Regions:
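Extended, charge-enriched "interface" segments that sit outside catalytic cores
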Residues: 1-81, 85
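Alpha-helix capping/hinge segments and adjacent helical runs
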Residues: 2-5, 9-10, 17-19, 256, ...
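Internal helix-loop-helix
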Residues: 59-60, 90-163, 167, 210-212, ...
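A structural-propensity feature for long, helix-poor, extended segments
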Residues: 154-160, 439, 445-487
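A short core secondary-structure module
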Residues: 199, 203-245
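C-terminal helix-coil-helix/basic helical segment that borders enzyme active sites and/or dimer interfaces
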Residues: 343-394, 490-504, 523, 527, ...
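C-terminal amphipathic alpha-helical interaction region
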Residues: 454, 466-568
C-alpha cells in the first residue's frame, strides 16, 4: 500500500529545514520535558526523528485506511437524525485509526496528553490526510482550534478541555450565520449571562459550520447588549455534553462530502466565556482564522498533490496515436506546470508554518517569563512575517489546487468527466478551498497593506541576497527584473492616492508579490536539492514571469477613468 509521507520525498526535505533547530529549541524549552516524559525528545536529533516517525505513521494510515475509504465516504456522506450527526462509516474508521495512533492534540503540551509538536510537522500531517480525503481532513484538522483555547483560555479550561481533544474528541469553530458570512462583525447569536446558574446562555442560529456536531465548539456570539459591530462580540466555549444545540440540517454540498457542514440552532445553550469580553472578533477569531487559513493552505497542497498524482499516472498509462499521452508536449506542458505550482506552493506553505512556529513559541514562552530584548525582536520579526505570508499561502495554494484539479480532469479527457475516476472528486473538493476561511478576495484584502507598506518588496530584496547555485543564477537575474516591475506597479498605485484604484488592482499586486516570493523559495530549494526542484524552478520561473508581465502591463497602462467601464 502507498505511504503518503515516504512516497513524497519533498515533505522530508521541507521537514529538515535548518530553521527547525531553532523551532525545536523554543518549543521544547531546551528539552526540559525529557526528565518528566519518557517519550519527550532528548535533543534536536531525537525530536526530528520523532517527527519523522509520526509522519510515517500518518502516511501509512492515510494510505491503508483513509485513501481506500475516500470514495465510499464521498458517496455515503454524513446523515442528520434527531438533531445529531452520524458520520459515514468510513469516517468513523478513519477517526478511530487516528485516535489509536495518538494523532490528536499534536501541538499541545505533554502535560495535557499532547505531543508538543511544532506547527510545521502537524501541518505536514494535515497535508498528507487531505491528499487522500480533504473532507475527512477537515474533521481531523479542526483539532487545531484547541490552539486558540490554549492561547486565550484560563488554566481551568486548559485542564478540563485540552486533555479531551488530545484523547480524540472533536472540535468546531462556530462563526458564520445566515446574515454574517465574510462580514463577521454582523454576527447576532445572542449571549446573555445567567446570574442564577453563573454561566452564559447562547441563543440563535449558526450556518455553514464545519463538523457542527463536534464535542467542543468555539463560538462567536454577541455579549454586549445594543451593539452592532465587532466590539460587541465575545468568544465562548460550548461543550456538547451540556446540551442545548441541535443540528437543523447538513448542507448538500458540491464537494468535501465526508465533512458535515451544519446549520445549528442554539436554544439557551450553556457556555463559558473564553478570554475577555468584547475581544472575540478583534483578537481571538483573528488568531483562530490565521490558524485555519494555514490549515486550508495545507489542504490545498494536499489536493494539488493528489491532482498531480492522478494526472501523471493517467498520462503514463493512456495511449493514443501509438504512444503514451505523456509524450505529447501539450500534456507534459500541463503536468510540468502542475508540478511547479505544487512545489512552489508547498515551499510557501512550509516557509509560512516555520515563521508561525517561531513567533507562537516565543508567545508561549512570554506567558512563562519575560522575554529578553533579543527574543522580543525575534518575536516581532516572525509575527510580522507570519501575518504577511499566511494570506499568500492560503490564497495562492487554494487557487493552485483548483487549477491543478482542472488540469487533472483535462489530462483525463472524457474519462475525467466520469464519476469512476478520482479526479472528479478532487475537482469538487478543491473548489471550496478558495472560498472558506476567507475567500481569495479577502486574502488579498489581508495582504494588500504588506504591498503598500513595502514589506513584501523588502522580503523579495532580502531573498535576492541569498546565494544560489550557478545553474540558478540566470533565473535569479530574471527574478530581479520581475521584482522591479512589481515595484513600479506598487509605486504607481501608491502615488495615485486613489482607494478605488488600489482595491481594483489589489489582486494583481497580490499575485505579483506571491509569484516573486514563491519563485525565490523554489530557486533556494533547487540550489539545495536540484534533483527534486531544478525542473520546477525553470518551469515556474517561465510561468510566473509571464504572469508578472501580464499584470505589470495592465497596471502601468490602466487609467483610473476606465473604472467606470468595469462597474456593473
Amino acid at each position: 500500500m502507498a505511504n503518503y509521507y515516504t512516497d513524497i520525498p519533498e515533505l522530508k526535505y521541507h521537514l529538515n529545514n535548518p530553521m527547525m533547530e531553532r523551532i525545536c529549541e523554543l518549543k521544547e524549552r531546551n528539552y526540559r520535558d525529557k526528565e518528566e516524559f519518557d517519550y519527550a525528545p532528548q535533543d534536536y536529533a531525537d525530536a526530528m526523528d520523532s517527527f519523522d516517525k509520526v509522519l510515517e505513521i500518518t502516511g501509512e494510515i492515510t494510505g491503508e485506511i483513509i485513501a481506500p475509504n475516500a470514495e465510499g465516504v464521498d458517496e455515503e456522506g454524513p446523515h442528520c437524525a434527531n438533531g445529531r450527526v452520524e458520520y459515514a462509516s468510513g469516517t468513523k474508521q478513519n477517526l478511530d485509526a487516528m485516535v489509536k495512533a495518538g494523532l490528536n492534540g499534536m501541538t499541545m503540551p505533554r502535560r495535557f496528553g499532547g505531543l508538543n509538536f511544532p506547527i510545521t510537522p502537524y501541518t505536514m500531517c494535515a497535508e498528507i490526510v487531505a491528499a487522500a480525503d480533504a473532507g475527512f481532513g477537515n474533521i481531523w484538522s479542526l483539532q487545531d482550534c484547541i490552539e486558540t483555547l490554549y492561547e486565550f483560555g484560563n488554566e481551568g479550561q486548559h485542564s478540563r478541555f485540552i486533555p479531551r481533544i488530545c484523547a480524540g474528541e472533536t472540535m468546531s469553530m462556530d462563526l458564520t450565520e445566515p446574515d454574517a458570512g465574510s462580514d463577521l462583525q454582523s454576527v447576532m447569536l445572542k449571549a446573555t449571562f445567567d446570574e442564577k446558574e453563573n454561566c452564559w446562555r447562547l441563543n440563535g442560529v449558526k450556518r455553514f459550520i464545519t463538523n457542527g456536531d463536534a464535542d467542543l465548539h468555539l463560538v462567536l456570539a454577541r455579549s454586549e447588549e445594543g451593539t452592532k459591530d465587532g466590539r460587541g462580540l465575545s468568544m465562548f466555549i460550548y461543550d456538547k455534553r451540556q446540551g442545548g444545540v441541535d443540528v437543523r440540517r447538513i448542507e448538500n454540498k458540491l464537494g468535501i462530502h465526508g465533512s458535515p457542514t451544519c446549520e445549528l440552532v442554539y436554544k439557551n445553550a450553556k457556555a463559558e466565556l473564553c478570554g475577555d469580553r468584547q475581544l472575540g472578533l478583534i483578537k481571538y477569531v483573528m488568531a483562530l482564522m490565521n490558524g485555519a487559513r494555514l490549515g486550508i493552505a495545507a489542504q490545498s497542497v494536499g489536493l494539488s498533490q493528489a491532482a498531480y498524482n492522478e494526472g501523471l499516472a493517467y498520462a503514463k498509462e493512456r495511449k493514443q496515436f501509438g504512444k503514451a499521452i505523456i509524450e505529447f508536449p501539450a500534456v507534459y506542458d500541463m503536468l510540468s506546470i502542475m508540478k511547479a505550482k505544487l512545489d512552489a506552493g508547498r515551499a510557501l506553505l512550509y516557509q509560512t508554518s516555520r515563521y508561525v512556529d517561531i513567533y507562537k513559541a516565543l508567545d508561549d514562552i512570554a506567558r512563562e517569563r519575560k522575554l529578553t530584548p533579543e527574543e522580543r525582536q525575534e518575536q516581532k520579526k516572525y509575527a510580522k512575517l507570519a501575518d504577511s505570508f499566511t494570506p499568500l499561502a492560503k490564497g495562492m495554494n487554494s487557487e493552485y489546487a483548483n487549477q491543478n484539479a482542472y488540469d487533472c480532469i483535462q489530462i483525463h479527457g472524457g474519462s475525467g468527466f466520469m464519476l469512476e475516476y478520482a479526479c472528479q472528486r478532487i475537482y469538487r473538493d478543491a473548489r471550496i478551498t478558495s472560498i472558506y476561511e476567507g475567500t481569495t478576495q479577502l486574502q488579498t484584502v489581508a495582504a494588500i497593506r504588506y504591498v503598500t507598506n513595502g514589506s513584501y518588496l523588502a522580503t523579495i530584496r532580502e531573498f535576492e541576497t541569498i546565494p544560489c547555485s550557478p545553474e540558478m543564477e540566470p533565473l535569479k537575474g530574471r527574478l530581479v527584473e520581475m521584482a522591479n516591475k512589481f515595484e513600479a506597479c506598487m509605486n504607481k498605485v501608491k502615488e495615485a492616492q486613489n482607494q478605488e484604484l488600489q482595491d481594483f488592482v489589489a489582486r494583481r499586486l497580490y499575485e505579483m508579490a506571491a509569484d516573486c516570493i514563491m519563485a525565490h523559495l523554489l530557486i533556494q530549494d533547487a540550489t539545495k536539492a536540484p534533483e527534486m526542484f531544478a525542473k520546477s524552478a525553470v518551469v515556474y520561473l517561465n510561468y510566473v514571469e509571464a504572469e508578472v508581465e501580464k499584470h505589470s502591463s495592465f497596471i502601468l497602462k490602466f487609467n483610473a477613468d476606465e473604472l467606470a467601464s468595469y462597474r456593473q
